[in-house]
Amino acid sequence: MKHLFTALLMAWAIAIPTQAQDWLYTDEVQEAEPLNNIRYKGEMQASFSKGQTPLWLNANKHGLSSLDKTNGYMRVALERPLQTDSARRWGLGYALDVVAPLHYTSNVVVQQAYIEGRWLHGALTVGSKQWPMELKNNRLSSGSQTLGINARPVPQVRLALPNYWTLPFAGGWLQLKGHIAYGMMTDDNWQHDFTGYQNSYADRVLYHSKAGYLRIGRDEDMYPFSVEMGLEMACEFGGTPHVKLADGSMVEMPAGKGLSAFWHAFIPGGQDTSDGMYGNMEGNQLGSWVMRLNYNADTWRLGVYADHFFEDHSQMFLLDYNGYGTGEEWNVRKDRRFYVYQLKDIMLGTELNLKYGTWLKNVVFEYLFTKYQSGPYNHDRTSNIPDHMAGLDDYYNHGNYTGWQHWGQVIGNPLYRSPIYNDNGVIRVLNNRFVAFHLGFDGDLSSRLSYRVLATWQKGWGTYVEPFTKAHQNASFMVEGAYRFNPQWNVTAAYGMDFGSNQMLGHNAGLQITVSRTGLLKTKANKKGNKR
């Protein structure tokens, strides 16, 4: 793993002078105009539900949603896309996106506030930005398991090679992209309100993510088949975790500090104080192996993809060391023996794009299985029993931190039941062992009217630590129509439903209406650009 990310950094450095972009195809020196091409967006949304807001009216909106049966917001955003300077060797982008919500967990939401710069092919972003999912359809997929689009953006400093760069060997068949980021969670006040300081919470938690993707393929017109594969990893570390003990008392748990904590977030290592003699890894480490196969035909494009989630070595590498001695040597590595885990937990999906389709344009179908989690047993070596079995992975939860969530919404796939649904003040994912099937499709009914449909069936068993007394089921459905009056005005109406037990999502039905206006801000720089 160390070599993987060292290679990623080296490739990013090599990529800077060689990747083909617009500025490589022109000798013209573009005048710097940092105030041109500023786009605006004004948006109003209202949701009305019987029960809570249904799943697909709430999920995968970058956390800009509420479960309250009546909620809404007014939103104003200004953005200068980084792509504005694609003809220059350097680029500048920035945005401010502010929301005034009704019946949300905040009175004011700064959804996005960032500035980013590009020099040749490397990009540096500082602030909160909505990042899309990789290797999946952002409108139709149920969501990535690690770096999803379900929670509010985390303010961060992010260094990236955002677009695939062709490596200068292998005949142009290999391309690479990736990122490294550090930031800080912003939901301290929400955690205080939600738990009432009576259950576990964590303040000033630091965030780290990294990802690297390799694509094998060439010009799709000549070579229609391509493969994409990658590793996504994230970590919550530092801060001040407050943990509720078995006797009901609250204790402040020491966490890693300083440069060593940042290093252990980047290269998993160290250990938490609570690990005791059985050192694990410092912080909440997690990630996914991802892969996608693509075939590009004349009239259609097909993608088949996989997303394998892990919380530790047992699912990251599907093996763990199990060669400890006995007696006085119970904690000494004696033999080359390993415990092999099964590859059961996985997300499998397929995406079909009809290039000239109208009524039907894109179809996504996904299958998720998360029941295994390295098995129902977790045992560390002792003087009597030397076997080491690292089961009970408890996806999205953690002993010291409040799990893979931000502002109550899971950061990954929303089929893991987000803590915001809990009514007991506990910030935990209470259903992370499930099987699910998901279908999404969209199309255009006319040149102005488009639609989108999402449908999901899920069967859950709770968690290993707190299992349901029996398996529970849930079905969620959404149909959405969008009408564009002109290039500036758009109206969207969506109807969603949930059918399930209270341990899942319950019975909900709701209507969501969104009105938006977009355009180009009238500035002197924009007027000058339009005259060219």
Where are these regions (language model features)?
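Transmembrane beta-barrel architecture of outer-membrane proteins
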Residues: 39-43, 69-77, 108-112, 154-158, ...
